[in-house]
């Protein structure tokens, strides 16, 4: 199942700088591991914002929940999830039916 996920980040300004550095490093490592595993398919930065739009490929809602819940930045995220389905005008849909 594919999901588009928007994540807006709001790390408190008064968070200890060492804690912030560690948190961001762990988030980056977790993100890369999920990308290598094929779970985190795409990630795009939202220009001018501390936010991203990502696409996840997971078995079900529960797996997506676990993936998001385990993000080190999870306590500081506002998350919007949209389930995705293939669009009939997608060129890949034409190729699959050929």
Feature annotation, model-predicted:
Residues 1-98:
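Conserved, structured core segments of small domains
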């Amino acid at each position: 199942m594919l999901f588009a996920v928007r994540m807006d980040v709001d790390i408190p300004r008064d968070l200890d700088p060492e804690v912030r550095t560690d948190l961001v490093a762990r988030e980056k490592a977790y993100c890369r591991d999920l990308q290598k595993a094929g779970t985190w398919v795409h990630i795009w930065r939202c220009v001018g914002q501390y936010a991203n739009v990502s696409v996840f490929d997971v078995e079900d809602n529960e797996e997506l929940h676990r993936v998001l819940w385990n993000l080190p930045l999870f306590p500081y995220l506002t998350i919007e999830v949209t389930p995705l389905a293939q669009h009939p005008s997608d060129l890949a849909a034409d190729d699959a039916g050929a």
